[in-house]
UniProtKB/Swiss-Prot annotation:
Region Disordered: start-end pairs: 1-108
Transmembrane regions: 124-144, 148-168, 178-198, 212-232, 242-262, 268-288, 297-317, 319-339, 355-375, 389-409, 423-443, 450-470
Residues with PTM Phosphotyrosine: 112
Motif (PPxY motif): 97-101
GO CC annotations on file: host cell endomembrane system; host cell perinuclear region of cytoplasm; host cell plasma membrane; membrane
GO biological process: symbiont-mediated perturbation of host ubiquitin-like protein modification; viral latency
Record organism: Epstein-Barr virus (strain B95-8)
Family designation: Belongs to the herpesviridae LMP-2 family.
Record topological domains on the Cytoplasmic side: 1-123, 169-177, 233-241, 289-296, 340-354, 410-422, 471-497
Polar residues bias (residue ranges): 27-41
Protein name per UniProt: Latent membrane protein 2
Amino acid sequence: MGSLEMVPMGAGPPSPGGDPDGYDGGNNSQYPSASGSSGNTPTPPNDEERESNEEPPPPYEDPYWGNGDRHSDYQPLGTQDQSLYLGLQHDGNDGLPPPPYSPRDDSSQHIYEEAGRGSMNPVCLPVIVAPYLFWLAAIAASCFTASVSTVVTATGLALSLLLLAAVASSYAAAQRKLLTPVTVLTAVVTFFAICLTWRIEDPPFNSLLFALLAAAGGLQGIYVLVMLVLLILAYRRRWRRLTVCGGIMFLACVLVLIVDAVLQLSPLLGAVTVVSMTLLLLAFVLWLSSPGGLGTLGAALLTLAAALALLASLILGTLNLTTMFLLMLLWTLVVLLICSSCSSCPLSKILLARLFLYALALLLLASALIAGGSILQTNFKSLSSTEFIPNLFCMLLLIVAGILFILAILTEWGSGNRTYGPVFMCLGGLLTMVAGAVWLTVMSNTLLSAWILTAGFLIFLIGFALFGVIRCCRYCCYYCLTLESEERPPTPYRNTV
């Protein structure tokens, strides 16, 4: 009985190779439990006998820690067998071990948000905004009596601008330190050249005006040559021939347009048109070279300068409305075909539908600007100073609507943000409606004023459709805001293969 009191039930002295807590893996056969006979209990061996008769302990059969060594299965990621991660070859991580943490997605995961949220390749951005280049080319052709040679030259200029912007967009980000100062310098000089031409009368062959135009054209040519040299040095041999051909085409078209403007005894119109095209190109390149911060602000300012130059060409030139509308419609179809068939930027049905709505809004805005220019040109000579101010104010509203549309395209397809683009379009539609309503109140060309009002309303509806009723509910509905404010529970990262 004394032995039963001294030895607990099922317990024994710790084995030498076992756990320090006294657990030896269940091998307690030499120490019987209390149910056995107490008289046959063997005496424990001494230290010498234990060392001579000791056998290695059985493996530690713990399902959590593994076999034998507790830390045998814990190796650094660099020393692990790569065959463990063969199943991860197609997960976008090149078969490497998963990271030690899983980053959370900061974007909203609203249950009603549309799937497949993506943005186009930035290289395709000039393709989307190319209608504005053709728009300005059509204005240039109309200002220069719309001869066949001028139409061909203006179209070639627009194509070369598109080609140069598309090639430069993929390289501008790597060379932003060099491109941005040259772009800003060229834009500032050309903008002040425009401002000075407004202060000078327009007699034929004015020497000061011609010198300003030559200086602006020279700086633009230097900028284009610098960009071409950078492109030639950066790209391989397969790009050099295309770049040189595009640069020569661009310079030739600019020279032909300037010569045509001088021969038509209208250097101001030619300068305004060419500079507006160049400013738009510089805005795109500047925005692509630094998509955030000062780059976007510079693009907006350059676009404003281009819009002011466009306003000058609308006031001073004569427009061929049918030619402009046909060019806009044709290029809209071309943009749709290019973007749907281009393999480098695959389009889903959602992106294609949004692109179609943007193209439709572009046609409506172009028709509103054409109608406003017609009203302003019709009443330009017969209006008094009191009647000219509201007409000019309405035209400026239309120009601001065009600027908002350009910013909508830049934010939509440049950054992938689908919120601010439709908001800009809605604001542009409201400004167009205000311009049409003012012209209806003044009773100047009632039919065109009514069409401007209708076009603004349709643009506003398109912007609201792009914004989405569900997204509007998300930002305004109390229940949706409550869902957005709820914190998501943190999920631990599991390194399971």
